[in-house]
Amino acid sequence: MCSRFSSTSLKCLLCSQNRHCSSGISTLLRSFSCITLSAISSSVNCSGSSFLGSSFSLFSSFSCKESLLRSGVFPSWLFCMFSSILALAISNSFFFFSSNACFSLLFNSFLVTGFSFSADLLVLAAAADTLESNVSNDIGGNCATRLFKL
């Protein structure tokens, strides 16, 4: 069944019987939940400044990306860092156009969360396609890539 998918990333995301693929998905979900919790906790404190709240979400997302760092794919770490810094710059620019500091902090936190999560998805898909030569194309669809090994 898995051999029908031409894209390696689709193969690894859709073939749930593979333990390496399911391990990668669970790592991604853990990372997203950690980033979301940090965004919510920083937006609850509405008295704080927008820059501090966004910075807290940014550094929390860095600490939640240990799986990408452990995978050995350096461009993915570089891309995540660039996208997080870009999200921080964009979100803080909204602070100057918003009169409500509470709403601005809430919006900024979830903007950083969205950028970080989309960066994770893009990195997982790109790295899986790059390592397509390392994927065995047997009947069981074994996506044995180093990316999804914990």
From Swiss-Prot:
Residues forming coiled coils: none
The entry's keywords: Membrane, Transmembrane, Transmembrane helix
Transmembrane segments: 77-97, 105-125
Membrane keyword on record: yes
GO biological process, one term: endocytosis
Other known facts: Present with 339 molecules/cell in log phase SD medium.
Annotated protein name in UniProt: Protein SLM6
Organism in which the protein naturally occurs: Saccharomyces cerevisiae (strain ATCC 204508 / S288c)
